[in-house]
């Protein structure tokens, strides 16, 4: 009872003191609410503006006076808490300033402290029946207001998202109508600023019916080619389901001769192979037998061994594993069972085991082998320079390194092996800690990380700064009489020396925009106003600032007018003058209102007439009715990310918009027309989501997931090939702009284009008309679907619009088509053309024998010949030339972003699977994932993308083609080394060995540092055409 009374008394005392001292002083710095991770330091600042009296500061925690110790202590007026604890330090903090001379007190508003922590997570079953499975992720932890707790669900190792019968609702997972496809172990992860934890024990769900299907067939009856069209009989035992424990053992002559070695130690980046030699009897060669490799108990790779059994790519065990992902590094050889790695990474470490399973029998497993990876020595992340506040109690600079064995981290100053300055130490984790920061701590500090692999270093610059403070703040309000003199003081201290800027009513004041005879700006920051006028009255602000921050104080100036100022008008008694002034003012105001109303009505009439004219033209062009403006407006409101046209390259392409631009409309009408045109464009691209089917996720891109699916053929419009028109316009523009040049130059350019066009027609194996007939006869079109998951990310939305405008503006057989846009609900889908053979990089790896594509009785496809490689390069150059003529840039040209069909037609596309499948080919630079090994130096240094930077990337693409995409450019260098050498201009390029001699010079010119010296795509196309003709001869 006594403790409660004391707590209530403390809160009442704090609230009363907030109004005691308001007239004599106020706070210059108030304590701010904070959220920190547990065991981190906290600092509450508190400072009063009363610099003329002696003040004493106290702190209250939840209404109680704080008992200070080594962990919680007060320095000056500020409160410092070392290693914040959630059990003791959470709550509200109030600063109390006491004037020792008068005894007056003032209390600051309470500041809240929240401690972020994360201990454990567990899966709880809330309900389970035939219609619904309901799970909850219970988390022991807390998050701040700015960063809520993030929950992710996994089935086995597969990350779940809201899809079909799966719904994610905050901490709960709801599966409606669960079936056999939903069997597995469900686990959840929780993450916040304190870290990430996964539930130790998950929930294993198993549907009620579980048995192995068996196919009944007569003797000497051949297996049908399609397994999915057979009828399976599933019989379970009475009283329970049949499981693997009821299966018989495999025949003894089916066995594994040699499994993986007991323990293998491999360096990161080196190749290796795991052995699994097996014996397969002749009488079992026609049976369905699977060879599987497991990592840490989870299925990694599998292949069918039976000679006549079809290769379905699916396992006939009940488990679902997320480790069955596409990875070009891993190859499972069917002949000898060997699992080979092209290059080892740190995540490959684990326990490996191979298995043989005959259908309907227990699997045969080898002895497990352990693969250990010697991780490369590197910084994670790279240490960065930092500004430290002078007199700060504790400041930290982190330096974390990874490698095998664990590296030792140490710090040196100014590149010397001398000891660190006083009050500077290094903790066990390699963090550099500064205590009681002073000016002697300035300098360059180098972090050294070393182990048996060697030593790496990183240098950071430490600068000590002082936050600007008011030594003499402006005090107000100030009252003065007209024609008087006012002096407003404003002096500041800080390091670097702060600058002082005055403003009046939020408008900056300087000697250039004020009366120099009346306004004087003194060197110490004081503002003096002589001969004060009535218009000088207002709010004056003084802002001080340096590299450590900004501060501001306001003061109100009140100008009192003398009684003589209004005496002549009042004593004159001439009311007619006043009446006349009022009448004139009202007449002018009324005329202005009438003018504005008239203009509004006139603009409205013009807009309606123009709208009717545009609708008539749109109806004639489309051959049918178009959605009205109201519908377009509604669509724009549903998608704020696509409500405006942001690409400056898009032009008016219709006759109606061209006529509208030539009209004498006002600026307001032009903006309205542009907005309606943008909405009309996106409405034309609209596709119903119901038209998509069989969506399969193949990876993740920069703004969301990427799928491959099918689109109804009825929703696919016939393509409009603008290649000929674009070439004609380009030729005319070159002739018009090149009037000052020689006629021979123009003639040679036209000849090159004719040769380029003729060569392209020669290598086309399928006519365009035949392709159109094939598309019309097909019931479904294979498409690539890019989802916009990050709707609130402005950068992701901008990139989504850029790609949308790029593919919408181009209609060329060398560039994939944009079929439409699904905007009915989130996430929005961009639907692009896709091919039956997929991306070009996987095709090159398959022809090089790096991807196992062989089926029973067939062999891997042969490598590409030189003429075929030149044909692929020529088609890519034609597609990129179309992008250049449309005044766009690609920014991510590579073989992974091109597609190829079974008719050997190559198109430029934009899958950009930078998050998982091709994550090794991207590097995070300036908080953006970039393909640094394909980028020109100006893109990395200045973030400047032009057609010349696409030509630089095209040279790398040709290098990939002649190397069959079996290795990365400059794979001997790390990503950081590539960035450093590219910025320094020391990254050297060389063409592939198989490159024809006639192309070496022009390909090397693609990589020159000066963009103006690089060739154009038309010149590259002409050179490739000549090379193809010479190879054919």
UniProtKB/Swiss-Prot annotation:
Keyword Repeat listed? The answer is yes
Where in the numbering of this chain does the Ig-like C2-type domain appear? 25-108, 109-199, 251-365, 368-463, 468-558
Q: Where are the transmembrane segments?
A: 582-602
Q: Where is this region: Disordered?
A: 617-679, 718-760
Q: Name one GO biological process term.
A: negative regulation of canonical Wnt signaling pathway
- Is Plastid included in the keywords of this UniProt record? no
Cellular component aspect of the GO annotation: axon; plasma membrane; receptor complex
Compartments it resides in: Cell membrane
Extracellular side residue ranges read: 23-581
Show the ranges annotated as biased composition (Basic and acidic residues). 720-731
Q: GO molecular function, one example? A: protein kinase activity
Chain positions carrying an annotated carbohydrate: 39, 336, 417, 429, 444, 457, 512, 524
Phosphoserine occurs at 678
* SUPFAM superfamilies named in the record: Immunoglobulin (SSF48726), Protein kinase-like (PK-like) (SSF56112)
Cytoplasmic face of the membrane: 603-1033
Output the InterPro entries linked to this UniProt entry.
Answer: Ig-like_dom, Ig-like_dom_sf, Ig-like_fold, Ig_I-set, Ig_sub, Ig_sub2, Kinase-like_dom_sf, Prot_kinase_dom
Q: Where does this chain mainly localize?
A: membrane
Please name every pair of cysteines joined by a disulfide bond in this record: 46-95, 137-188, 276-354, 399-447, 490-542
Biased composition range(s): Polar residues: 655-673
Task: Name all Protein kinase domain ranges.
Answer: 692-1028
Per the similarity annotation, which family is this?
Belongs to the protein kinase superfamily. Tyr protein kinase family. Insulin receptor subfamily.
List the PANTHER family. Answer: TYROSINE-PROTEIN KINASE RECEPTOR (PTHR24416), TYROSINE-PROTEIN KINASE TRANSMEMBRANE RECEPTOR ROR (PTHR24416:SF611)
The name of this protein is Tyrosine-protein kinase-like otk
């Amino acid at each position: 009872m006594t403790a409660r009374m004391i707590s209530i008394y403390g809160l009442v005392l704090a609230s009363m003191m907030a109004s005691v001292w308001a007239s004599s002083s106020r706070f210059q710095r108030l304590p701010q609410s904070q959220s920190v991770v547990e065991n981190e330091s906290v600092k509450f600042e508190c400072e009063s503006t009363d610099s003329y009296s002696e003040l004493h500061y106290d702190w209250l925690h939840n209404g109680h006076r704080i008992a200070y110790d080594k962990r919680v202590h007060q320095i000056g007026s500020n409160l410092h808490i070392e290693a914040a604890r959630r059990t003791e330090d959470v709550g509200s903090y109030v600063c109390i300033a006491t004037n020792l001379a008068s005894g007056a007190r003032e209390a600051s508003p309470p500041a809240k402290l929240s401690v972020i922590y994360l201990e454990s997570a567990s899966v709880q079953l809330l309900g389970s029946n035939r219609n619904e499975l309901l799970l909850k992720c219970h988390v022991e932890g807390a998050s701040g207001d700015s960063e809520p707790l993030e929950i992710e669900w996994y089935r086995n190792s597969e990350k779940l998202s809201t899809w079909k019968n799966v719904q994610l609702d905050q901490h709960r997972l709801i599966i409606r109508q669960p079936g056999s496809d939903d069997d597995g172990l469900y686990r959840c992860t929780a993450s916040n600023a304190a870290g990430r934890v996964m539930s130790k024990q998950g929930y294993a769900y198993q549907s009620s019916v579980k048995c192995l299907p068996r196919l009944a067939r007569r003797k000497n009856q051949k297996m049908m080619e399609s397994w999915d069209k057979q009828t399976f009989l599933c019989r379970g035992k009475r009283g329970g389901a049949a499981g693997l424990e009821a299966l018989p053992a495999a025949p003894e002559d089916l066995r594994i001769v040699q499994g993986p070695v007991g323990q293998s130690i491999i360096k990161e980046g080196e190749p290796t192979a795991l052995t699994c030699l097996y014996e397969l009897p002749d009488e079992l060669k026609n049976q369905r037998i699977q060879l599987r490799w497991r990592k840490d108990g989870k299925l990694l790779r599998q292949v069918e061994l039976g000679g006549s059994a079809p290769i379905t790519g699916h396992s006939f065990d009940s488990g679902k594993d997320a480790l069955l992902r596409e990875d070009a590094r891993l190859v499972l050889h069917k002949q000898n069972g060997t699992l080979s790695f092209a290059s080892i990474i740190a995540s490959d470490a684990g326990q490996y085991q191979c298995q043989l399973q005959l259908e309907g029998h227990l699997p045969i497993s080898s002895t497990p082998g352990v693969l250990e990876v010697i991780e490369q020595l590197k910084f994670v992340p790279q240490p960065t320079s930092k500004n430290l506040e002078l007199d700060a109690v504790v400041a930290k600079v982190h330096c974390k390194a990874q490698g095998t064995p664990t590296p030792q981290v140490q710090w040196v100053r100014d590149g010397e092996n001398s000891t660190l300055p006083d009050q500077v130490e290094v903790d066990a984790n390699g963090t550099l800690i500064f205590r009681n920061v002073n000016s002697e701590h300035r300098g360059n500090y180098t972090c050294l990380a070393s182990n048996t692999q060697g030593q790496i270093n990183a240098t950071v610059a430490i600068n000590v700064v002082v936050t600007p403070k008011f030594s003499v703040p402006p005090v107000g309000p100030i009252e003065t009489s007209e024609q008087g003199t006012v002096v407003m003081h404003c002096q500041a201290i800080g390091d670097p020396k702060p600058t002082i800027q005055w403003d009046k009513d939020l408008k900056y004041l300087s000697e250039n925009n004020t009366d120099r005879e009346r306004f004087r700006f003194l060197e110490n920051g004081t503002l003096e106003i002589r001969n004060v006028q009535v218009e000088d009255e207002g709010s004056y602000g003084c802002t001080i600032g340096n590299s450590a921050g900004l501060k501001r104080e306001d003061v109100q100036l009140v100008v009192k007018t003398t009684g003589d100022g209004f005496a002549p008008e009042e004593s004159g008694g001439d009311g007619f003058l006043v009446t006349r002034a009022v009448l004139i003012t009202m007449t002018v105001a009324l005329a202005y209102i009438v003018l504005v109303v008239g203009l509004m009505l006139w603009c409205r009439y013009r807009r309606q007439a123009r709208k009717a004219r545009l609708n008539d033209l749109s109806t004639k062009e489309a051959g049918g009715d178009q959605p009205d403006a109201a519908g377009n407006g509604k669509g724009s409101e549903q998608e704020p990310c696509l409500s405006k046209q942001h690409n400056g390259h898009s032009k008016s392409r219709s006759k109606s918009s061209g006529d509208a631009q030539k009209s004498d409309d006002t600026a307001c009408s032009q903006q309205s027309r542009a907005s309606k045109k943008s909405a009309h464009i996106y409405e034309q691209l609209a596709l119903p989501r119901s038209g998509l089917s069989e969506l399969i996720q193949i990876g993740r891109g920069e703004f969301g997931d990427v799928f491959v699916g099918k689109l109804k053929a009825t929703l696919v419009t016939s393509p409009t090939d603008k290649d000929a028109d674009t070439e004609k316009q380009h030729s005319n523009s070159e002739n018009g702009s090149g009037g000052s040049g020689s006629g021979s130059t123009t003639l040679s350019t036209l000849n090159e284009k004719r040769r380029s066009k003729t060569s392209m027609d020669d290598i086309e194996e399928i006519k365009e008309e035949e392709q159109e007939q094939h598309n019309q006869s097909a019931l479904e079109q294979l498409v690539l679907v890019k989802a916009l998951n990050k709707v609130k990310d402005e950068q992701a939305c901008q990139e989504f619009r850029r790609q949308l405008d790029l593919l919408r503006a181009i209609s060329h057989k060398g560039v994939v088509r944009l079929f439409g846009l699904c905007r009915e609900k989130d996430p929005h889908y961009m639907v692009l053309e896709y091919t039956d053979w997929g991306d070009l990089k996987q095709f090159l790896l398959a022809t090089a024998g790096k991807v196992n594509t062989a089926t029973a009785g067939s062999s891997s496809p042969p490598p590409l010949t030189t003429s075929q490689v030149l044909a692929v390069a020529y088609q890519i150059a034609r597609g990129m030339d179309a992008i250049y003529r449309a005044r766009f840039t690609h920014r991510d040209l590579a073989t992974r972003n091109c597609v190829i069909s079974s008719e050997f037609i190559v198109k430029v596309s934009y899958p950009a699977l930078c998050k998982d499948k091709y994550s090794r080919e991207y590097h995070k630079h300036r908080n953006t994932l970039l393909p640094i090994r394909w980028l020109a130096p100006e893109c990395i240094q200045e973030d400047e993308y032009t057609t010349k930077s696409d030509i630089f990337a095209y040279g790398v693409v040709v290098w990939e083609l002649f190397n069959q995409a079996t290795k990365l450019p400059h794979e001997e260098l790390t990503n950081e080394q590539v960035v450093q050498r590219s910025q320094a201009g020391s990254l050297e390029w060389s063409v592939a060995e198989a490159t024809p001699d006639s192309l070496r010079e022009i390909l090397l010119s693609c990589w020159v540092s000066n963009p103006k010296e690089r060739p154009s795509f038309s010149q590259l196309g002409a050179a490739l055409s000549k090379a193809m003709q010479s190879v054919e001869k």
